[in-house]
Amino acid sequence: MAKYEILYIIRPNIEEEAKNALVSRFDSILTDNGATIVESKDWEKRRLAYEINDFREGLYHIVNVESEDAVALNEFDRLAKINGDILRHMIVKLDA
């Protein structure tokens, strides 16, 4: 199984309940498509290097995933691009 790290930035003015729902929704997208979540945790609220959609800060969330194929990652990528609450996201394949 290949190991991946997903980092995404959530808009800072989201309510706590909505943020938790967003995180659980994207975690379930990964698991429903065959990936195994090793760890999913909030990182911290950080200042952005440049302004994104009028925001200067963002809530960082990091997910470590194991997957045999890229189906779950492609679906995560597709849905993260069209979600207005996620400012940016990045998927990195880790060395085994």
UniProtKB/Swiss-Prot annotation:
Origin organism of this chain? Streptococcus uberis (strain ATCC BAA-854 / 0140J)
Question: Any keyword RNA-binding?
Answer: yes
Q: Name one GO biological process term.
A: translation
Record function comment: Binds together with bS18 to 16S ribosomal RNA.
* Entry-linked Pfam families: Ribosomal_S6 (PF01250)
Q: Does the keyword ATP-binding apply?
A: no
HAMAP family tied to this protein: Ribosomal_bS6 (MF_00360)
Q: Which cysteines are joined by disulfide bonds?
A: none
Q: Which family does it belong to?
A: Belongs to the bacterial ribosomal protein bS6 family.
* Top-level taxon in the UniProt lineage: Bacteria
Gene Ontology cellular component annotations, sorted alphabetically: cytoplasm; ribonucleoprotein complex; ribosome
- Give any GO molecular function from the UniProt entry: small ribosomal subunit rRNA binding
What keywords does the record list, in alphabetical order?
A: Ribonucleoprotein, Ribosomal protein, RNA-binding, rRNA-binding
What is the official name of this protein in its record?
Small ribosomal subunit protein bS6
